[in-house]
Amino acid sequence: MGFADVWVVAGPPGVGKSMVADHLLALLEPVPALLDKDTLYGSFVAATLSEAGRPPGEREGAWYDKHVKVHEYGGMTAVAREIRSRGCPVLLCAPFTQQIRDAARWRSWVEELGGGVVRLIWVRSDSVTLRHRLERRGSPRDAGKLAAFDAFVTRMQPDTVPTAAHLAIDNRQTARVSIEEQLRAALDALEADFRCTGGRYRQAW
């Protein structure tokens, strides 16, 4: 049995990844197993930060990357590989900022996932939309981001296209097409490509 497909929904915190993932799950058949970083690790991260005396809203930076993020992403990758090796597709939902902005790192990560078909869906935003969404959801996790918002935007680059091949889903306030319509159009094009080539995909994303 070969490795099943992986769908990666990526983008900055607060950009609307979970919403995009929900729409995508409703359109895919078979339905992938969803691995959402916040669902998997949210309470564990909060406990780790508290025990280490770190700010409760800390979700990035050198300390976080070394002591927390490496284990979050390492765990998600290992579980995704194990699930898809049994023939079940997987949908990963997390920022994956470093992976999507470095082509070599992306290729290496795809291999860690088991290779095969790994499709990146990047949720596009901008600073105005991002601030609005972070303020509206009112999560303690976002306190540090809002306190130094300009620096956060500079790091996250919500409107900068990833290096890795991807499908962009526009979730800015100015978007004229709904998320579901964007996804449907992309999946329809993917299916048409598959039929035209006799069961082979030409599209990179």
Regions inferred by a protein language model and the residue ranges of each:
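Hydrophobic anchor at the beta1->P-loop junction of P-loop NTPases
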Residues: 9
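P-loop (Walker A) phosphate-binding loop of NTP-binding proteins
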Residues: 12
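ATP-binding Walker
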Residues: 15
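Walker A/P-loop
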Residues: 18
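Conserved substrate/cofactor phosphate-moiety recognition/catalytic segment
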Residues: 22-74, 81
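Glycine-rich phosphate-binding loop used to anchor ATP phosphates in small-molecule kinases
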Residues: 64-114
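Conserved phosphate-donor/acceptor-positioning beta-strand/loop module used by diverse small-molecule
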Residues: 113-135
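Small-molecule kinase domains that catalyze NTP-dependent phosphoryl transfer to phosphate-bearing small molecules
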Residues: 136-184, 188-205
